[in-house]
Amino acid sequence: MAALGLSVGLDRPGMAMKIKEIKTYVLEAMLAEPFAYSQAWYERRGALLVEIVGEGGISGWGEAFGPPRLTAPVIDFYTPLLVGADALATDLLWQTLYNRLRDHGQKGLAIEALSAVDIALWDLKGRHLGLPIHRLLGGPLREQVQAYATGFYRKRHGHPLDYLLAEAEERVAAGFSAIKLKLGFGIDDDVRLCQAVRKKIGDGVGIMVDANHAYDAPAAIRLGRRIEELDIGWFEEPVPPEDLRGYQEVKAALSIPIAGGEAEFTRWGFRPLLVERAVDILQPDTCAAGGISECKKIADMANAFGLRVNPHVWGTGVALAASLQLIAALPHNPPALHPVEPLLEFDQSEHPIRMAIIEEPIVQRAGWVEVPNRPGLGIAIDRQAVEKFRIR
């Protein structure tokens, strides 16, 4: 074994750390006012956090995208494979967990749970070594990230144009220089919203749109052609994630950049999007697509194919911190004196848990967010707040 270099240095301080315990936290909070996107109504927000405790009591934290009550049992399944293993061997552990459920969970809940574990392992590694994750990934390429405001959901009461235009003004007044509108409520409705928002906020603010796969390719093309003149930054999830050919048709028909990938998983899942040139912008979610380990691989693949990467984010401060650490290490694509930089998706809709569970909220100033530079994710968890929202 030593001849192969597998045990060299493992007796030195800092070269290994055994995992002592895995803890899961299912969190939930009711919303003051329900809201909807093109697929469903939300009456509550939830989160699944994972805490991995290493030797010496050091903890790392991660978060899983997706339904917390369904993802938690997968973490329970992974736990015996993790306890006693070397927490610093992030890639080895990723492969171990993925291969264990490979025949049953190449996408979906198994990978979302794996994502949370992977993020927690990177947080633990960074805390153990005294470095932020972006330094362990070879960065930073940037120390602050431009954020765009996500929100613009539908409510049960009031006229959508009234409250959505007011929200657009509010986001711009708060300092955001780009916003993302939720579409998928009918082509005419979507066009009216885009036109009204562009007129209200002017040409100096970026507008992206997201249909959350509410259309088929012909409808998405009709919609896209009617809003092309509004200088749309990208058209996100125009068609269902399974419809690769539909993505290609929409991309070929429109001048608006096409974005997608929040409902895709692992490098193998993203490979067809790259090889078939189905999108212009990839959007892996760090808490869903396989964690920091896998999203860095996906980003490097995208770089080789000349595609931009803007990670999807829709979680708590843990998810935001993980995305910021990843974005800080993403390569410029293409490289240039003044390159197009990746953006941070910063959800502005109601989420009682989001910032409550971290001791120092992540904030934007003039539309920019600083990348946390303390060890690991760079955040501290408020355990009292976690217990306040915990239901399991």
Language-model-derived ranges and their functions:
Residues E63, L114, K182-G186, N212-H213, ...:
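Glycine- and other small-residue-rich loops at beta-strand/loop junctions that grip anionic moieties
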Residues I19, G57, Y78, V117, ...:
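Conserved, mostly hydrophobic/aromatic
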Residues G138-L254:
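Metal-dependent enolase-superfamily TIM-barrel catalytic cores that perform enediolate-based chemistry
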Residues A16-W61, F65, E350-I358:
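Structured beta-strand/loop patches that form or line metal/cofactor-binding pockets in enzymes
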Residues L6-A16:
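Short, Lys/Arg-enriched N-terminal segments with co-localized hydrophobic residues
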Residues I52-H128:
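Metal- or metallocofactor-binding catalytic centers and their adjacent structured scaffolds
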Residues A72, R225, D231, E242-A259, ...:
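Shared catalytic-loop signature of beta/alpha-barrel
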Residues P375-R392:
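Extended hydrophobic packing segments that form well-structured cores
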